[in-house]
Structure formats: structure tokens, C-alpha cells
């Protein structure tokens, strides 16, 4: 009774299940941004010109931009792309969960796509692919395969416990690598995926209490995924949804004393909240493999 097509991959013994879209619901794309309009424009143009799924709205969440050209761009892009809407997060500092939660408040879609402003869609059916997985009744959230600018792997799922908290799997692997047991290229369940590109059912997002604003920068997406799993839903990694991710351009890196202190407090918060999960180990990662590096 499942509408799907099963095809074999070139590698012997591996298959792909391609689910048919049940319908074409509205997808709300939530894009936090601060200046760096070149990156934002590249992201939006890929949504408009590369992506083929059309029932979408773009909620651009402006947070503390400083350049006049940024606001001129907002005026222009909302005229050029009617489905784009700029909303203003007016608090001080940076709080990724708060920014995204506000974006959701200003959206209407049945499905939410959290998308970094420094991403760019690679394959035309990227959004359709994410949606086809997210429409499955047992699935709560779906993540994509992300590449660095040089084409190497930036994200192919998240491993709980890596580095003491959580880390991306297969970072730095070559673009066409299969990975351990072909995990880079196969659709599968994970404990978490990155919110640099993550689709979530709206009702599930609300059911689990949204993003926890206590994680201003780090681990908010992992925390959300674990709450979704705790509620009984699956987290799916879909390598057939591909994007480039020009990581951390608009926010910067953890390179000041204040940022390091904030990061350490978020590590502590995560380790206390998910102590049992960390002790038991990630059910989607072999206990025989190291957590010291990916």
C-alpha cells in the first residue's frame, strides 16, 4: 500500500526506495540572515532556478544586519520574488533557535525547511526528495547531504557522542566516496541531522516544543532531533537531496573568549539533558567504532 519505486544502485547489493509525493503541500523555507547578501541571493536563486518544487514560501529572518545595501536588497528581492517575505528579529546578539522560531511564527506551511543562508541547492529535485521522505507518517525530520565549496563532504548525518557531544559523519570525505558500509550514499535513519538544511513536519515541530532557545548557537538542531525521536518519530538522512554549504560565513567562528564560554555552557546543557542517550550510545553508530573523530 506504499506508493514508491525501488531501484538498484550501481554498487551491487544496494537499493533506493523513491517515495511518490502524496500531494504538494506548502513548504515554508526559513532562512536566517545577517548581511552577506551575495550568499543569500545565491541561496534564493538556487531555490528559484534550480529547485523544481514550486509550492513554497521563503521567510527571510533578518537579524541585526548593518549594511544599507542589505536592506536595499530586501526591498528589491521581495518585489522580484513574490513568495519571499522578510521579517525582522530585533533582539540583540545571536540566538539561532529564537530566530528560527520567529520565522515559523511568520510562516504558513505544513512543512518547515530550515535552511542556512550560505547554502545552495545542487540537484533540481532536492526539495521534492526531502518532502517525499518527510511525508512518511513515521518520519519527523529529514536532512540532506551537504558539500563544502571544494566538493568534499560537510554533512552526511550526525553521530551522538562524537567529540563528547555530537559531530557530523564523514566530514572531509571525497565527493563520490561511498563511506563506511556505503552510509554516505544510502537513505537511512540517524539520531540527528543538521539544521543547515532540515525539513520538519510543522505539527511535529510544535509537538516537541520547537527549538530550545537555551542553545543560542550550538547543538540546537541535535537537541530538536533527539526530542523528535523521543516523541516516537524517525530522523532520516537523504543523500539524494544535495546542497553546497559555505559554512559559517555570516556568523563567524568560535574564536573569542566569550564565544568559547558560551559554547562550553551549551555543551554542559546538552550533556545534562541527554545524559542517558550519551551513556547508552548512538543506536545508529557501532560501539566498536571511535567517537574521537569521524
Question: Which ranges hold each PLM region?
Answer:
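Cell-envelope/extracellular polymer assembly enzymes that use nucleotide-activated donors
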Residues: 25-30, 57, 223
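A conserved hydrophobic helix/loop-capping motif in glycosyltransferases and polysaccharide synthases
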Residues: 28-39, 43, 50-51, 61-63, ...
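Acidic donor-binding segment of Leloir-type glycosyltransferases
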Residues: 48-92
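A short, conserved alpha-helix in the catalytic core of glycosyltransferases
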Residues: 1, 126-130, 184-209, 213-244
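Conserved donor NDP-sugar-binding/catalytic core segment of glycosyltransferases
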Residues: 119-165
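C-terminal, non-catalytic tails of nucleotide-sugar-dependent glycosyltransferases
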Residues: 1-27, 150-151, 162-189, 235, ...
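Short aromatic/hydrophobic "clamp" motif used to bind/position activated sugar donors
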Residues: 112
Amino acid at each position: 500500500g506504499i506508493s514508491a519505486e525501488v531501484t538498484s544502485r550501481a554498487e551491487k547489493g544496494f537499493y533506493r526506495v523513491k517515495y511518490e509525493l502524496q500531494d504538494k503541500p506548502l513548504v515554508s523555507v526559513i532562512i536566517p540572515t545577517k548581511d552577506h547578501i551575495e550568499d543569500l541571493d545565491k541561496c534564493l536563486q538556487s531555490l528559484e532556478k534550480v529547485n523544481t518544487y514550486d509550492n513554497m514560501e521563503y521567510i527571510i529572518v533578518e537579524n541585526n544586519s548593518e549594511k544599507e545595501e542589505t536592506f536595499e536588497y530586501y526591498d528589491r528581492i521581495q518585489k522580484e520574488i513574490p513568495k519571499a517575505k522578510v521579517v525582522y528579529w530585533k533582539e540583540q546578539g545571536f540566538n539561532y533557535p529564537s530566530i528560527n522560531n520567529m520565522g515559523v511564527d511568520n510562516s504558513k506551511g505544513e512543512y518547515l525547511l530550515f535552511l542556512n543562508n550560505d547554502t545552495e541547492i545542487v540537484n533540481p529535485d532536492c526539495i521534492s526528495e526531502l518532502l517525499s521522505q518527510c511525508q512518511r507518517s513515521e518520519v519527523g525530520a529529514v536532512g540532506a547531504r551537504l558539500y563544502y565549496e571544494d566538493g568534499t563532504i560537510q554533512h552526511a548525518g550526525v553521530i551522538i557522542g562524537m567529540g563528547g557531544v555530537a559531530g557530523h559523519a564523514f566530514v572531509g570525505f571525497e565527493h563520490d566516496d561511498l563511506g563506511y558500509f556505503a552510509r554516505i550514499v544510502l537513505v537511512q535513519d540517524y539520531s540527528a541531522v543538521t539544521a543547515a538544511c532540515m525539513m520538519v513536519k510543522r505539527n511535529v515541530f510544535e509537538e516537541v516544543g520547537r527549538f530550545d532557545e537555551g542553545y543560542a548557537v550550538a547543538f540546537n538542531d541535535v537537541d530538536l532531533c533527539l526530542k523528535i525521536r523521543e516523541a516516537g518519530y524517525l530522523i532520516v538522512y537523504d543523500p539524494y537531496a544535495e546542497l553546497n554549504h559555505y559554512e559559517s560565513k555570516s556568523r563567524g567562528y568560535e574564536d573569542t573568549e566569550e564565544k568559547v564560554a558560551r559554547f562550553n555552557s551549551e555543551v554542559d546543557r546538552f550533556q545534562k539533558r541527554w545524559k542517558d542517550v550519551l551513556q547508552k550510545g548512538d543506536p545508529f553508530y557501532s560501539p566498536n567504532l571511535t567517537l574521537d573523530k569521524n
